[in-house]
C-alpha cells in the first residue's frame, strides 16, 4: 500500500534521523571495535569493527537516498543505493576474510578481559536496536536500501555477541582458540553472499529504470 504524500515525508524524515543516529553510534563502535581488535588480537572484533564501518557507509547511502524530498518514491535512486551497498559489502567481506584467515594461519590467540566483554555487550545491543528501527522503516517505506542497512546492523549485533561467545569459550577451553577466526570467516562469507545477491538483483533494475525515470 502506497503511503500518502504527507505520510511518506514523515517517514522519510524518520529514516534520515535514524541514519544520522546510526552514523554517530556505529562510528563510535567502529573505533572501539578496532581498538579491541588490535589490543586483544581478536579476528571477530576486527570483523565487527569493519562491519560497523560498513554500517556508517550504508547509513550515508541511505541519507543520500532520502535527502531529496521529491525522490522519496524514486525507484532508480533506490536501486543505485542498493548497487553501491552491494559493492561495499563485497569489498568489506574480503578484508574481514583476509584478517580472519591470517589469524587462523598464524594461530594468533585472542586476549580475554573485561574491556572486551563490555565493548561486545554494548556493541551487540546498540546494533540490534538500530537494526529493528531500520527494518521497521524499511518495511513502511518499502525500501530495500533501508532493509539492507538494517541487515548490516543486525550482522553487527550478531558479531558483537559473537565476540563475547568466542572469548568466553576461549577462556574455559583454550584449545578452541580457532573459534574467533572461524566466526570471522563465517561473517565475511555472509556479508559477501548478501553483497553479490544485491548486485545480481539490482544492476538489471538500474538499467531498466534509467530510461523511464528522470534521475533526481
Curated annotation (Swiss-Prot):
Query: Catalysed reaction per UniProt?
Result: Zn(2+)(in) = Zn(2+)(out)
How is this protein annotated for GO cellular component?
A: early endosome membrane; late endosome membrane; lysosomal membrane; plasma membrane; synaptic vesicle membrane
Family matches, as Gene3D superfamilies: Cation efflux protein transmembrane domain
Keyword Transmembrane helix: yes or no?
A: yes
* Location (main, coarse): membrane
Give the UniProt keywords, A-Z.
Cell membrane, Cytoplasmic vesicle, Endosome, Lysosome, Membrane, Synapse, Transmembrane, Transmembrane helix, Transport, Zinc
Q: Where is this protein found?
A: Cytoplasmic vesicle, Secretory vesicle, Synaptic vesicle membrane; Early endosome membrane; Late endosome membrane; Lysosome membrane
- Superkingdom, natural source: Eukaryota
Residue ranges in the Cytoplasmic topological domain are: 1-15, 65-77, 136-144, 204-216
Question: What is the similarity comment for this entry?
Answer: Belongs to the TMEM163 family.
Task: Give the function comment from the record.
Answer: Zinc ion transporter that mediates zinc efflux and plays a crucial role in intracellular zinc homeostasis. Binds the divalent cations Zn(2+), Ni(2+), and to a minor extent Cu(2+). Is a functional modulator of P2X purinoceptors, including P2RX1, P2RX3, P2RX4 and P2RX7. Plays a role in central nervous system development and is required for myelination, and survival and proliferation of oligodendrocytes.
Know the name of this protein? Transmembrane protein 163a
**Organism expressing this protein natively:** Danio rerio
Amino acid at each position: 500500500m502506497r503511503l500518502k504524500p504527507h505520510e511518506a515525508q514523515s517517514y522519510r524524515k524518520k529514516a534520515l534521523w535514524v541514519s544520522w543516529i546510526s552514523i554517530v553510534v556505529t562510528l563510535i563502535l567502529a573505533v572501539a571495535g578496532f581498538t579491541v581488535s588490535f589490543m586483544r588480537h581478536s579476528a571477530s572484533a576486527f570483523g565487527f569493527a569493519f562491519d560497523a564501518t560498513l554500517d556508517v557507509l550504508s547509513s550515508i547511502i541511505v541519507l543520500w537516498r532520502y535527502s531529496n524530498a521529491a525522490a522519496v518514491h524514486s525507484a532508480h535512486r533506490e536501486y543505485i543505493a542498493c548497487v553501491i551497498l552491494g559493492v561495499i559489502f563485497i569489498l568489506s567481506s574480503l578484508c574481514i576474510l583476509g584478517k580472519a584467515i591470517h589469524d587462523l594461519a598464524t594461530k594468533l590467540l585472542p586476549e580475554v578481559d573485561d574491556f572486551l566483554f563490555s565493548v561486545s555487550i554494548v556493541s551487540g545491543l546498540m546494533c540490534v536496536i538500530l537494526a529493528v528501527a531500520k527494518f521497521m522503516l524499511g518495511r513502511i517505506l518499502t525500501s530495500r536500501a533501508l532493509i539492507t542497512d538494517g541487515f548490516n546492523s543486525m550482522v553487527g549485533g550478531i558479531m558483537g555477541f559473537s565476540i563475547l561467545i568466542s572469548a568466553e569459550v576461549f577462556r574455559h577451553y583454550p584449545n578452541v582458540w580457532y573459534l574467533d577466526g572461524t566466526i570471522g570467516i563465517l561473517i565475511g562469507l555472509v556479508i559477501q553472499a548478501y553483497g553479490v545477491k544485491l548486485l545480481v538483483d539490482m544492476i538489471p533494475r538500474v538499467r531498466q529504470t534509467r530510461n523511464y525515470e528522470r534521475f533526481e
